[in-house]
């Protein structure tokens, strides 16, 4: 912000990328203020012509899909970790973490550091990484080759149906019901390429 050749627009979003590096941006000027000036615009549309463009639009976390995954108490692991680390809020006291990658273990470790014992279900058969070994050394309950079949509970998660899954991911073992009050899911990350695909 202090650089003389940089303009920062905080409440703005680029939504179009056209020929010859022309971008279109919408800026929200005062729609967030409780009382705005009488004749000031709520939004402003910018047409930007750039010599060069750097797109850093990030990625979107995908959920894993299972029955009743729209029940209150089912959320992304990144959201659960954010609530805990930024706001000091536990999303549950008996969390179940259902994953197919290593990113969930960061959330499991955060739960454990805050006195909560999570259960981790990992679709992979025997993954090996530093963060998984750290979770194991902390005594976190990890069940490999397991999946969530469905969330159970009326108005909120009270339990989950889980099962062991075969190596080829086609067959399920015996279905069991385990008690939990939230289900955290990280599916993986999808790059946000919408602007890049317009250029």
Q: Where are the regions a protein language model picked out?
A:
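Residues forming the flavin
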Residues: 1-199
């Amino acid at each position: 912000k202090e650089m003389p050749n940089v303009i920062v627009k905080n409440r703005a979003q680029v939504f179009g990328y056209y020929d010859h590096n022309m971008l279109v941006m919408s800026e929200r000027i005062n729609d967030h203020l409780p009382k705005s000036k009488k004749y000031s615009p709520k939004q402003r549309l910018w047409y930007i012509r750039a010599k060069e463009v750097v797109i850093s639009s990030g990625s979107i976390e995908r959920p894993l899909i299972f029955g009743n995954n729209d029940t209150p108490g089912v959320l992304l692991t990144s959201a659960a970790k954010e609530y805990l680390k930024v706001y000091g809020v536990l999303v549950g006291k008996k969390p179940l973490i259902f994953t197919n990658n290593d990113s969930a273990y960061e959330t499991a470790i955060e739960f454990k550091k805050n006195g909560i014992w999570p259960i981790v279900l990992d679709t992979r058969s025997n993954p090996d990484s530093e963060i998984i070994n750290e979770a194991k050394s902390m005594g976190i309950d990890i069940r490999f080759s397991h999946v969530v079949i469905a969330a159970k509970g009326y108005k909120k998660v009270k339990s989950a149906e889980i099962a062991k899954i075969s190596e080829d991911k086609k067959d399920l073992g015996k279905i069991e019901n385990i008690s939990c009050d939230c289900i955290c899911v990280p599916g993986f990350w999808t790059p946000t390429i919408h602007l890049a695909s317009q250029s």
